[in-house]
UniProtKB/Swiss-Prot annotation:
GO terms for cellular component: plasma membrane; proton-transporting ATP synthase complex. It comes from the Bacteria. Keywords: ATP synthesis, Cell membrane, CF(0), Hydrogen ion transport, Ion transport, Membrane, Transmembrane, Transmembrane helix, Transport. Signal peptide: none annotated. This is ATP synthase subunit b. PANTHER family: ATP SYNTHASE SUBUNIT B (PTHR33445:SF1), ATP SYNTHASE SUBUNIT B', CHLOROPLASTIC (PTHR33445). Belongs to the ATPase B chain family. Coiled coil: none annotated.
Amino acid sequence: MTNVIKYLAEGEALPLEDHPSVLLPASYDIVWSLVVFIIVLILFWKFVRPKYQEVLTEREDRIKGGIQRAEAAQAEAKAALEKYNAQLAEARAEAAEIREEARAKGKQIEAEMKAKATEESNRIIESGEKQLAAQREQVVTELRREMGQNSISLAERLLGDQLSDDVKRSGTIDKFLAELDTVSPAGK
């Protein structure tokens, strides 16, 4: 350390300090640093860069493949959505058609049932009218017979004489009933 102080006191430079610049290293340091840098650069260029390029290319291919797969999946999904929408529209149209057919069939069944009910009602009314007419005829016939008998008895009492002849009896009954019909028509 005394040597350093001696050199500094005399104003001389230290033995390892030949160069005047503080920022620039010694020339031999620059040369050897360049040699090592070139060797490292060559090694990097020969071994690291191709692997790095291969990894980048592979990654680029994977990204492109992923994009293509995504586009294909998106196109497939879009096609599936369009197919689904088409099937949905078809199903809705079919449902509307079935609904309309059911309405038409329901109206047809309703009309048939109304027609059958009307027909049955008319048949029942007609049957009732026929039955009523038959009963009316039966009642009229019974009334004529009874009235005929009653009129004969009444006529015999009034005349005091007995009508023995069936022809006379029948004629008298018919005449009486004809007069009765002209005065008041039967059943009306």
